[in-house]
Amino acid sequence: CALPIFLLGALIVTLLFRRDSKLNSAARQMQEFIGDASHELKTPLTVIRGYSEMLTSNPNKVSEYSARINSESIRMTNIIDKLLKIAALDETNPLQTREIELSDYLQKYVNDLKILQPNRPVKLQANPLQITTDLEVLDTLISNLISNARIHSPIDAPIHLSLEGRNLIIEDGGPGLKVIPDKPFQRFDQSRSRESGGSGLGMSLIQKSAKQLGVKMEFGKSELGGLKVSITF
């Protein structure tokens, strides 16, 4: 009789340990996220405050300083928008799926890039592929991956999108993002992200949207010189 009681006790201890481990992991991730978000919001707020104070002592610079304040306000709004998107990407929310032609869908991003940065070589190589997906979550995934490629590479560096079977590959001419092989989503070079005008929150959106869609992602070095991201649908 003692053996079953012992086994039951061991099972309870194991379950409690697993629960606590999951809670600790979630708490750690939340703490890191809040720390990163606070840091990102603090930077534009500091700039806004600095230029606001200089306005009182140097009224001749009103136009220049006001433009800088407006620029940082827009940046802060974009950061807040990303934070709201991250909060909205709840894995428990059911996906609103529909069937789309992926090659046609990707073409709009190529067209946008050519308008935004006409000097950048942009190429799409894709065969037709029908997939069933949540379009809003997919938009979050693809737009942030392309935004990372655009922000973290020179304006004349190439960005290539290719669709091979059910694999979508997005790569850029670099230097791209720093890849951490064992934990590709955690702690990308965020200081460099801020220097390039990014918020450092894009990878959180990519991670959450990829997980919600159930797609497999791999990161590596592109032959173009930058980052290569492979997504399997």
Question: Each predicted region: which residue ranges?
Answer:
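Short alpha-helical segment of the dimerization/phosphotransfer core of two-component systems
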Residues: 71-76
